[in-house]
């Protein structure tokens, strides 16, 4: 069956979309296919009543059909009420309900060839179109896409964890994020880059206090509305939370921080090295500061690089990484750190 869609570069109106098909990509550019009962497939599903397709359906469908969690979404085609888009992310290992099918990762060219050979030339064409869109994404569009999807989802959250992009309760949150503090061994200042509603700032202060370490928290986020939310939640630190882009933000008063935490997916994959260099040069305290680097979707057992592996591949000396400790639940993806000179 041939698929004939109209190329698009923006989100269709909500009432125009009833079905979505998504092409998943890993941060390294490989395409992910699902091995289903009927053969190779792509995540696809209906928009349910009451769902916002941009927030709800694009999250639910790849989790339910592929066990894949997206961090970035971009539409590229529309056929009537059927939307085609690509997502970038990784296989999911967290607390949300999700499938655990067999996944195959390959270059987009190889993925399209496998689909064609499996008798699905229609899906092969979808993968090729997605790859063209994925290759041409520029930095400005990447950040705009992040704002239009994550900002709305976080602001709609009913719990502090929801408002920080996490799909579990406070106990799951601690299990998934507490390990970040393993790299904090002394009192000092802490900057959370991509702080959202400020929950990680708040949590790190409390968790370190359990070990007798006093941390003074600070935060930045790309979304000004999330910055305002964090300031409302944490009025005692309102003057320490700023709006800014992780790739080029510098402290307004020129200060440096003893600990700086960054997420690799704050920037496009090809800018990760620039992200690390910028913060080592501009936000981490010289001569003893530490840059903590996380990639929450990393899974070395499945071949998705950990933060430490990514740092080494980019040419940085990794001074250590977290172990996850002894908390119950699935082990979190380890945080790694680089020490300043």
Whereabouts are the PLM-identified features?
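Nudix hydrolase/Nudix homology domain
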Residues: 97-143
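Acidic, metal-coordinating catalytic segment for phosphate/diphosphate chemistry
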Residues: 1-21
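Class I SAM-dependent methyltransferase SAM/SAH-binding core
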Residues: 199-237
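Conserved Nudix-box catalytic region and its N-terminal flanking loop in Nudix hydrolases
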Residues: 26-65
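Active-site-adjacent beta-strand/loop module that shapes the phosphate/pyrophosphate-binding cleft
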Residues: 74-110
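Class I SAM-dependent methyltransferase Rossmann-like catalytic core
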Residues: 146-180
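Conserved beta-strand signature within the Rossmann-like core of class I S-adenosyl-L-methionine
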Residues: 288-296
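A short, conserved alpha-helix within the catalytic core of class I
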Residues: 268-279
